[in-house]
C-alpha cells in the first residue's frame, strides 16, 4: 500500500542516524509523492485520505524507529509529523484554487502579449537556440568525465586485483595471512573510488543550475518590453519554468548518484567472494581473482554506457520546457495547464522555511559553550 510506503520513507528520512542526512528536499519529496499518488488514485484517496490516520501511523512508526535515540530526533518527530500532515491537507485544498489562479494569470498574459505574438515567439525561439548552444558542451563534458573517471576507477581496482594475484603466486602456502589485508583493502578501495567518482560527477548538475538561471534571466529581459503591465505575472511564469528546469538538474544528480551506488553494489559481492575463498585452495582463489578482473570490466563499461547519454536527455528536457512556455504564452495555447509545478514549488519553499526556522530555534536554545581556560604562563627563564 502506497500510504504505508510513504510513511515508512518519511520515518526513515528522520532517523537515518546523522542529522546532515535529514534534508528539506527529502521531506518535501515524500509529501509531494504522497499527494501525487492520491491525486492519481481516487479509490485510495477516498479510503486513506484521513488526516488522523496519517498522523497516527506517522507517530507509531516514528516511535517504533526512534525509541530513545536522542533529543534532536525526538524534537524532529514532534515538529515534523504535524507539519507534514498539515502540508498535505493544504496541498489538497489549494490545488483547485491555484489551478484557477494560474489559468487567469495565463489568460491575462496572453491577452497582453497577443499584439506582439510573433516577436514573443521569436524571442523565445532565440532563447531556445542559445540554451542548446550553452548546454551542448556540458553534455559532451559529462560524457567525457564519465568515461575518464570510470576508466580511472577500473584501472585503480584492476591494479589492486593484479597485486593480489602476484601475492597469491608468491604465498601459495600461506594464503589467508598474506592476502587478507589486500582483500580488506580492496573492499575499502571500492567504496573510496565510488565516492570519488560521485564527487567528480555530481557538481556537473550544480553548474547546470547556474546556466539555467542565466538563461531564464535573459529570457525575462528579452520579453520584458512586451509585458510592461503584466511583468509580475510573467516573472511568476518564469519562476515556474526555472523550478522545472532545476528539478531536472536535481534528477540528473540523483541518477548519477544512483548509478554510482549501483556500481558499488555490483562490485562488492565479487570482492567478498574473493575474501571468502581465502580459506579454500589456491586454484579456487585464482579463479575468483580472474573473475574479478572480467567483472570489473563489464560493470564499469555498463556504468559508462548507462550514464553517458544522460546529459543529452537532460538537454532535450530543458529545451522542451522552454518550448512549452512558448506554447502557453502563444495565441493557440488551448487548455495547457501547469499549476501542479507551482504547487510543488510552493510546497518545497514551505518545507525549506520550516527547516530554517527549526534550525534557528535550535541554535537559540543551545547553551553557549564556555570559553576554554587559558593556561597560566610558565615562569620566566632567568
UniProtKB/Swiss-Prot annotation:
- Keywords from the named record: Chylomicron, HDL, Lipid transport, Repeat, Secreted, Signal, Transport
Region annotated Disordered, chain positions: 362-382
Q: Enumerate the residue ranges of region (13 X 22 AA approximate tandem repeats).
A: 33-330
MF term (GO), any: phosphatidylcholine-sterol O-acyltransferase activator activity
Instruction: Give one Pfam family.
Output: Apolipoprotein
The record, for Gene3D superfamilies, names: Apolipoprotein (1.20.120.20)
Q: Which top-rank group of organisms is this from? A: Eukaryota
User: Might you name a Gene Ontology BP term for this protein?
Assistant: cholesterol metabolic process
- sequence repeat ranges are 33-54, 60-81, 82-103, 115-136, 137-158, 159-180, 181-202, 203-224, 225-246, 247-268, 269-286, 287-308, 309-330
Q: Which GO CC annotations does the UniProt entry carry?
A: chylomicron; extracellular vesicle; high-density lipoprotein particle; low-density lipoprotein particle; very-low-density lipoprotein particle
> Any signal peptide, and if so, which residues?
1-20
**Subcellular location per the Swiss-Prot or TrEMBL entry:** Secreted
The UniProt entry, under SUPFAM superfamilies, shows: Apolipoprotein A-I
Q: Which PANTHER family match?
A: APOLIPOPROTEIN, APOLIPOPROTEIN A-IV
Q: What does this protein do?
A: May have a role in chylomicrons and VLDL secretion and catabolism. Required for efficient activation of lipoprotein lipase by ApoC-II; potent activator of LCAT. Apoa-IV is a major component of HDL and chylomicrons.
Q: How does it assemble?
A: Homodimer.
Protein's UniProt name? Apolipoprotein A-IV
Amino acid at each position: 500500500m502506497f500510504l504505508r510506503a510513504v510513511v515508512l520513507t518519511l520515518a526513515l528520512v528522520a532517523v537515518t542516524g546523522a542529522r546532515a542526512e535529514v534534508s528539506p528536499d527529502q521531506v518535501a519529496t515524500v509529501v509531494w509523492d504522497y499527494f501525487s499518488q492520491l491525486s492519481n488514485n481516487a479509490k485510495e484517496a477516498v479510503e486513506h485520505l484521513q488526516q488522523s490516520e496519517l498522523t497516527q501511523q506517522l507517530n507509531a512508526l516514528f516511535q517504533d524507529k526512534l525509541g530513545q535515540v536522542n533529543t534532536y530526533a525526538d524534537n524532529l518527530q514532534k515538529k515534523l509529523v504535524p507539519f507534514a500532515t498539515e502540508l498535505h491537507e493544504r496541498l489538497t485544498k489549494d490545488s483547485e484554487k491555484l489551478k484557477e489562479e494560474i489559468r487567469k494569470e495565463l489568460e491575462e498574459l496572453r491577452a497582453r502579449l497577443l499584439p506582439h505574438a510573433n516577436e514573443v515567439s521569436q524571442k523565445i525561439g532565440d532563447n531556445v537556440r542559445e540554451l542548446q548552444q550553452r548546454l551542448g558542451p556540458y553534455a559532451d563534458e559529462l560524457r567525457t568525465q564519465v568515461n575518464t573517471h570510470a576508466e580511472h576507477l577500473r584501472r585503480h581496482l584492476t591494479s589492486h586485483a593484479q597485486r593480489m594475484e602476484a601475492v597469491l603466486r608468491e604465498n601459495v602456502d600461506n594464503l589467508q595471512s598474506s592476502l587478507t589485508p589486500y582483500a580488506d583493502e580492496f573492499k575499502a578501495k571500492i567504496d573510496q573510488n565510488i565516492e570519488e567518482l560521485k564527487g567528480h560527477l555530481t557538481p556537473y548538475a550544480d553548474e547546470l543550475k547556474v546556466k539555467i538561471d542565466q538563461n531564464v534571466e535573459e529570457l525575462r529581459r528579452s520579453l520584458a518590453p512586451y509585458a510592461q503591465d503584466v511583468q509580475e505575472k510573467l516573472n511568476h511564469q518564469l519562476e515556474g519554468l526555472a523550478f522545472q528546469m532545476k528539478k531536472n538538474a536535481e534528477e540528473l544528480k540523483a541518477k548519477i548518484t544512483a548509478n554510482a551506488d549501483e556500481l558499488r553494489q555490483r562490485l562488492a559481492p565479487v570482492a567478498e567472494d574473493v575474501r571468502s575463498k581465502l580459506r579454500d585452495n589456491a586454484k579456487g582463489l585464482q579463479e575468483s581473482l580472474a573473475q574479478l578482473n572480467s567483472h570489473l570490466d563489464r560493470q564499469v563499461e555498463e556504468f559508462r554506457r548507462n550514464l553517458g547519454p544522460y546529459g543529452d536527455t537532460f538537454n532535450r528536457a530543458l529545451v522542451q520546457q522552454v518550448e512549452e512556455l512558448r506554447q502557453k504564452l502563444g495565441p493557440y495555447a488551448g487548455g495547457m495547464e501547469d499549476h501542479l509545478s507551482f504547487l510543488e514549488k510552493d510546497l518545497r519553499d514551505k518545507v525549506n522555511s520550516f527547516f530554517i526556522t527549526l534550525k534557528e530555534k535550535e541554535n537559540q536554545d543551545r547553551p553557549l559553550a564556555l570559553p576554554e581556560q587559558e593556561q597560566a604562563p610558565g615562569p620566566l627563564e632567568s
